[in-house]
Every structure is written in structure tokens, then in C-alpha cells.
Swiss-Prot record:
Family: Belongs to the krueppel C2H2-type zinc-finger protein family.
Protein name: Zinc finger protein 786
GO biological process: regulation of DNA-templated transcription
Gene it is expressed from: Znf786
Any one GO CC term of the record: nucleus
Length: 777
């Protein structure tokens, strides 16, 4: 396989020259950097061939002479160096930046009459649409790099990979004496425009050029042109190789980095911060970032000189550029800047103060806030923001809006249109900001961070609402009772106590809600939909908050703990209910009997005693219950399940029954009578005992008007009115109301006359006293 093509390489091929006018526009540090780059390029050529004579430019640099003059007319050195262009360490990136800064004020008006076919030049001269011209073309006098970029595209070093490479370079050298193809005579202010390489249309700002090129990417002509460019690039082999190790590279900049390994030169270092860099162009960019230029009139500092020139251009631009409305916005030479005081920033130069740029050139100013604007419409827009004036009105809903641009978004919401769609899930949105928040939720990104507690949020509004907790800020106040709240939703929920409106009502049960999202959650009760499923136990829930609280059961996380007893809870609401145990607060009162309860569920269950409602019915036996938990415990009996078991082997369907049973083993009697100091194991026993002191008999038989202190006594009594005899004898079939009566009857068949024990006597006496008490009542 043949190696890379070799041809005579001289210092003129890697050098760049300035005219006297261009040299004067360079700053001192840029001149020193240029001299250093030229010396480095010369040392690279010397390392390849020691017999190379010293050029006149290097001699002037070493003697410290002023560098300007007609450098285009130089003698060619007598000796030529035959080497591969791929092995030369050339710093062209820094030279390009020097050219851009020096030729910012010097604009050429030379017209090139040479016409080259772009497709032909691609294969013949190594150039194509969108590439730069060879760096050696730039030393010709009178050719501006800005104009070259405007008509001929960007610039890179071009290496020809054909056998007739030397002949092609001669054709290029003959073309240097003319100018670049396609260069036209333009005025000085038009030379700062950016040109699209596809349609040749000019624009003032680069972001407009980028948007324009994105539009071309959809056209068929652009796709054909780009496909040809890629095919031509693929045909060129990687012939840029290192002579030391033979490694090949696609771009020259990769070879430049690789040559530093062989030469082991000392890396360039910044004289101020002593920071080292791999390449001098990186050091040059570091100089630009650290060195700040200052505007001479407004004393505002900038990082680059282009910002200073742009500031000067805005101050000195003619009046018709500010007032003429016929010029399209993307072709106006100056960027739009707004006031910094009220946070209305423009697209560029956000560090400029209003007094610097706006000064006398902006005739329209806001009287209250002091903001200055280029046109009267901008001033009127800010005035409407502060005064609350609505400029436009929707023809469909008659709603008035501050800005005309909001009218389209508002009409999309009325029609149900969602022009912005998510590519992953297909969900639609009326605004782009809604899509942005949606993508953060899908990706799990939480870019908003609280500096005090370290909690992350996916939306900025969530962070602002969270920070009110740290600041103890309550901006929302009730107009009736003057209570303040952190969130607006809490205020709306509070206002319902004063008779607030509930505009969203359920069509099935008629229940009304303040928010539409609450109505959606309620509709899942009727439809039975449970969209949130636990990934561990596969249990489904109607609400996402309930799912999160359920997942804490698996993780054993208890983020909400009581400050008095240290008990932890998985939900904030459970902690709030627990606080009432310590404080003794009972905020829920029954309107009929004035009894108070700690929980709202307890009040609802109690009210069913007055109404007789039993909404929870067992699907197997049809038995109804007032409380849902009692129905679930009853269903466990049908399945033979006893999830709560004692150490003695006895099982229970409810945990409360297990707790009551454990007191039989421990002997604990937590319920004490305040009058006689007698203690009881169950609360029901205490209530029954207190009836002896008060004489109260709350349980009433509806058939015979008898009253009882205990519910069990009433149920035993009601068996008298029923024809059923649930306890039947197996021998004779006689039925009995009570089980004790059946036991006495069985002794007749067995003829067993046992001596009653003392516990049986006490039991008989208690039954006797209960019957006597029922008869006396």
C-alpha cells in the first residue's frame, strides 16, 4: 500500500501575514502570541530538515522589529523541504482567531471573477460547499476573512489525496492572485452578516442562521447535497499518519495532539494562574476568558472584545434602525435589550446596564419603574403588566388577557386542542412548559434543590411552595376569619367552612368538590378503578398518595414521629390523629346526642346508630355492618382465616379482639370506675357497670318496651319474642332459647345428678339476678 503523498513544504505554506492596517488593530498580547506561533511553526520545520534557511519574518521577530509592510512580495527560499504535510505541527486555530480580531474593522471590497464548480472543486482542489479555504490563501493582500466566510463557508486545512496533488496545488496558487469564488462587492455594515451555505440568505444573528439551516434540513435539495458531501468524505482515506510510529489520523488536529507525545515538549502554561494546557489554542481561549475588556464610555466590563464592539454598535447605530418597523426582526443589526431592574433581559449582553446602552437612544421610558425601551409598544406592554390592564380579549369566552400571544394558548385550552405532544407516551399539552415538566417526571429529573434541607423537586413551583415552610411564610389569608395558609389549595379548602362554592359535582351521587382533580379521584370510587399498583405485593390503590404510604410498610419507614412518645407513623394524617390522644382533643361532635370523637370516621360510624344504616353487607351470608372493618373481619370467618393468634393457640379475626384476649393472660384491667374504683378488662364492662350508679339503661327492646344496661342482655331477651329455638336436643328434638337450658335438659336423659360446683352456682345466680332485673324493669 502506497504511503501518503509527499511534496515540497516551505515556511510560506504554514505562515500567515498581516497588512499594516490589520497589524495596527491587533493588541499587544495578540502580537506576542502571533510571534510565538510563527516561531513554533518554524521550529517544527527545522526539526524535519536542518538545512532550511531562516525566513525573513523569523529574522525580524528575533531582532524585535515592527512587523508590517508588503509581505506578499517575498522571495521563495532556495531550498525546499520534502515532507508529508501530515507531520507538520501547525497552529492554525490561533491564527484564525487572530485574523478575526484584526479584520473586524478592515473590510475588503475585492470581487473575485473566477468561477469554480463546487462539485469539481471538491475532487480537484479539496474544497466543497461548507468547507474553508486553504490557510495559505489568506496571506494575499486585500482579501478579507470575513468576506471569505460569508460566501465560501468555514475554513479548515485541506489535504489533497490524489496522485496529481502537486499539479492541483499549482492551480490553487494561480487562483490566489485573484480572489475567492463568489465574492461580491458589499458595504462595510453588510460584511458582518451571516450567510447560509444552502440558500445564500443573510441574517444578523447566528441563532437565526441555525434556525434557518434547520428548516433547510427538511427539504429534498438539502438532503441530496448533504448525502453527496458524506459520500465524498467517506472516499478519502485516513492518510494523515505519524512518521514516528505510523499511526494514522482522520484530522490534522488529532495528529498535532499525538506529536506532543514524541517531542515531549513542556506544555504551555498561563503566566497568571500557572495553569498548564495541552495546546496553545486552549491557552489562547483561557486568556480570552480571564482577560476582561472594558467599554470606554460606560465602564462596563466584558469577557470578549466582540461584546465591547457590539455595545459600541448599539450606541452608535442610526435612528432608523430603532424606529423602522419594515425591517424584519431577524435582520436587525442590533440585539434587543431590556431593563435589568425588573428582570426583563434580552437575548444577548445581559451584563449591560440600562444607563450604558439605553441612555438617550431609547426615547420611551416607564415613568414609575424607570425602564427604557426601543419602541413605544414595548413600553406599553410593561405598563399593562404593572397596571393589570388587559390588552386582548378572547372572542369565545370573552376573557381578557395581558398579552396577545397568550390568546392562542387560551383558545387551545377552550377547544381541547393540545398541539404539543410527548414522544414517549403520546400525552398532549397546550404549552411547551407543560411538556418540559412532563419530561422531567418521566426521566425522574429533579433539578430544583432546596438549600436548607436538601430536598429535590421536578418543578420550580413545588420548590417555592416548599421554601415557605422554612420561611414560615403564609401569603394566603382568609378574608372572613383572617387565618393564613402556606398554600392556596389549603385556603380554598378552609373557605368551604364559610360556605364556599363547590363547582364540580358528581353525576352519580351528587357530591360536590372544589377542584376537578378531586372529582376525578372520587369517580374512581364508582368505577372501581385502581390505577396505582404496588410492585412488591401487587395491591392496587385509587390514589397515588395512598400507594406511597403503603410502600413505607414494606420499607419499614416511619418518617412522621411523635415528639412525646416517639411513636412513628407512615402518614402525616395519622400523626395528627395521634396528637389528639395526648391533647385529649375531640373536634368531631354528633349533632343529635352531642357526643364528641377524635376521628371523623368514628363520628360517621356513630351517626349510623341514630339512622340505623348498615351500608357494608357480606356478599356470602348477606349480614350487614355499620363499619367496614367489622365486615372484613366477618369475611375471614367464612374463609376460616384467623390472622391474629395468641400464644395459647386461640385465633381472632380482629387485632382488637386479640388485645382484649391478651389481658386475660396478663391480668391487666385498664378501665377503672371513677366512683367505686373498681377496674375492668373491657371498656364495655365499665360502661355496663356505670349504669348501676347512674341507673341508665340505654338498650331498649322494640317489642315489649323493656330496657337493659347491656346489649347482650337485650339480645338474650329478644329470643323470647322469636319463634326460633336455636338450641335443640339431639335425643328428643326439643328446642331451647338458651344454651344453659339445653344443658339442664340433657341431664334428664343421662340421669346424671352432679353436684354443682361453686363457679356454676355463681353463674346461675348471675343469670337469676339478670332475669329478676328484667322483670322488675
Amino acid at each position: 500500500m502506497a504511503g501518503p503523498a509527499r511534496f515540497p513544504l516551505t515556511f510560506e505554506d504554514v505562515a500567515i501575514y498581516f497588512s499594516e492596517q490589520e497589524w495596527q488593530h491587533l493588541e499587544a498580547w495578540q502580537k506576542e502570541l502571533y510571534k510565538q506561533v510563527m516561531r513554533t511553526n518554524y521550529e517544527t520545520l527545522i526539526s524535519l530538515d536542518n538545512g532550511l534557511p531562516k525566513p525573513e519574518l523569523i529574522s525580524w521577530i528575533e531582532l524585535g522589529r515592527e512587523l508590517f509592510g508588503s509581505w506578499g512580495e517575498k522571495k521563495k527560499p532556495d531550498k525546499e523541504t520534502h515532507c508529508s504535510i501530515d507531520d507538520v505541527h501547525v497552529h492554525l486555530a490561533i491564527e484564525e482567531q487572530l485574523l478575526e480580531s484584526s479584520q473586524r474593522a478592515v473590510k475588503s471590497e475585492v470581487t473575485c471573477h473566477s468561477q469554480l464548480n463546487p462539485l469539481e472543486s471538491r475532487h480537484s482542489f479539496g474544497l466543497a460547499v461548507g468547507e474553508r479555504v486553504d490557510a495559505s490563501l489568506r496571506h494575499d493582500q486585500g482579501i478579507s476573512l470575513v468576506n471569505a466566510q460569508t460566501r465560501c463557508g468555514e475554513a479548515v486545512v485541506s489535504v489533497v489525496h490524489s496522485s496529481s496533488e502537486a499539479a492541483q496545488r499549482k492551480v490553487l496558487s494561480s487562483h490566489r492572485t485573484l480572489a475567492l469564488p463568489g465574492l461580491q462587492r458589499v458595504s462595510s455594515w453588510q460584511s458582518t452578516q451571516n450567510s447560509c451555505p444552502v440558500c445564500r440568505e443573510n441574517s444578523w444573528e447566528k441563532n437565526h442562521l441555525v434556525k434557518q439551516q434547520k428548516g433547510h434540513s427538511k427539504s429534498r435539495s438539502y438532503r441530496v447535497w448533504k448525502k453527496f458531501s458524506r459520500q465524498a468524505d467517506a472516499k478519502q482515506p485516513w492518510s494523515i499518519s505519524c512518521l514516528g510510529c505510523g499511526k494514522s489520523f482522520r484530522l490534522k488536529q488529532y495528529l498535532v495532539r499525538h506529536l506532543d507525545i514524541h517531542t515531549r515538549k513542556r506544555p504551555p502554561q498561563c503566566p497568571k494562574c500557572k495553569m498548564c494546557f495541552h495546546h496553545e489554542r486552549t491557552l489562547f481561549s483561557h486568556h480570552l476568558k480571564n482577560s476582561s475588556s472594558q467599554h470606554p464610555t460606560c465602564d462596563t466590563s466584558f469577557r470578549t472584545d466582540s461584546s465591547v464592539d457590539l455595545c459600541q454598535q448599539i450606541q452608535e447605530r442610526p435612528a432608523f434602525w430603532r424606529e423602522d418597523t419594515n425591517v424584519p426582526s431577524r435582520q436587525k443589526p442590533g440585539p434587543s435589550l431590556d431593563c435589568e431592574d425588573c428582570c426583563h433581559m434580552g437575548s444577548k449582553l445581559k451584563g449591560l446596564q440600562c444607563g450604558c446602552i439605553l441612555g438617550e437612544d431609547r426615547p420611551h421610558s416607564h415613568t414609575e419603574y424607570g425602564n427604557c425601551f426601543l419602541s413605544q409598544s414595548k413600553q406599553a406592554g410593561l405598563c399593562r403588566t404593572h397596571t393589570g390592564e388587559k390588552a386582548s380579549q378572547c372572542p369565545e369566552s370573552n376573557k381578557r388577557l395581558c398579552l396577545r400571544g397568550l390568546q392562542n394558548v387560551h383558545q387551545h385550552g377552550l377547544r381541547g386542542e393540545k398541539p404539543v405532544f410527548c414522544r414517549k407516551c403520546g400525552q398532549g399539552f397546550t404549552k411547551h412548559c407543560g411538556l418540559t415538566e412532563h419530561t422531567r417526571i418521566l426521566s425522574g429529573e429533579k433539578s430544583f434543590w432546596c438549600a436548607q434541607c436538601g430536598r429535590n423537586f421536578s418543578q420550580k413551583g413545588q420548590l417555592l411552595r416548599h421554601q415557605r415552610l422554612h420561611l414560615e411564610e403564609k401569603p394566603f389569608q382568609c378574608t372572613m376569619c383572617e387565618l393564613r395558609f402556606h398554600l392556596k389549595s389549603r385556603l380554598r379548602a378552609h373557605q368551604l367552612q364559610h360556605g364556599g362554592e363547590r363547582p364540580f359535582s358528581c353525576s352519580e351521587c351528587g357530591r360536590a368538590f372544589t377542584h376537578q382533580c378531586k372529582l376525578r379521584e372520587h369517580l374512581r370510587v364508582h368505577s372501581g378503578e385502581r390505577p396505582f399498583q404496588c410492585p412488591e405485593c401487587h395491591k392496587s390503590f385509587r390514589l397515588k398518595g395512598v400507594l406511597k404510604a403503603h410502600q413505607r410498610i414494606h420499607s419499614k419507614e416511619r418518617p412522621f414521629s411523635c415528639g412525646e412518645c416517639g411513636k412513628g407513623f407512615i402518614r402525616q394524617s395519622k400523626l395528627t390523629e395521634h396528637f389528639r390522644v395526648h391533647s385529649g382533643e375531640r373536634p368531631f361532635q354528633c349533632p343529635e346526642c352531642d357526643r364528641r370523637f377524635r376521628l371523623k370516621g368514628q363520628l360517621l360510624s356513630h351517626q349510623r346508630l341514630h339512622t340505623g344504616e348498615r351500608p357494608f353487607q357480606c356478599p356470602e351470608c348477606g349480614k350487614s355492618y355499620r363499619v367496614k372493618a367489622d365486615m372484613k373481619a366477618h369475611q375471614l370467618l367464612h374463609g376460616g382465616q384467623m390472622p391474629f393468634s395468641c400464644q395459647c393457640g386461640k385465633g381472632f379475626a380482629k387485632q382488637s379482639k386479640l388485645v382484649e384476649h391478651m389481658r386475660t393472660h396478663t391480668g391487666e384491667k385498664p378501665f377503672q370506675c371513677p366512683k367505686c374504683d373498681k377496674s375492668f378488662r373491657l371498656k364495655a364492662q365499665l360502661l355496663s357497670h356505670q349504669g348501676l350508679h347512674t341507673g341508665e339503661r340505654p338498650f331498649h327492646c322494640p317489642e315489649c318496651d323493656k330496657n337493659f344496661r347491656e346489649k347482650g342482655h337485650m339480645l338474650r331477651h329478644q329470643r323470647i319474642h322469636r319463634p326460633e329455638r336455636p338450641f335443640a336436643c339431639g335425643d328428643c328434638g326439643k328446642g331451647f332459647i338458651y344454651k344453659s337450658k339445653l344443658a339442664e335438659h340433657i341431664r334428664v336423659h343421662t340421669k346424671a345428678c352432679q353436684v354443682p360446683r361453686e363457679p356454676d352456682i355463681k353463674k346461675r345466680l348471675s343469670q337469676l339476678f339478670a332475669m329478676i332485673e328484667a322483670d322488675w324493669s
